[in-house]
């Protein structure tokens, strides 16, 4: 997680919240597992995020699979009970920036 925090640090002011989810956060990953990262930002292009994470991919020797949402889009997906977002929110997370309390719209009830 520290490698990812370091590569995202220059973008931190533009990130509302960022976390690792999936097998890495669950502790069930293998050397071949990718690292799933979800970022909520209102003014970051996917290319900026991808470029930052590519450095971490080289360092870690693992593929990083980023998902990027704007705050309003993330809130709408929570409100609409979007399957992917609901599943991710229910799973363990390793926060790279922010905490559970910083998630837009909070946790679904």
For each feature predicted by the language model, list its residue ranges:
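Catalytic core of pol beta-like nucleotidyltransferases
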Residues: 1-17, 25-32, 41-109
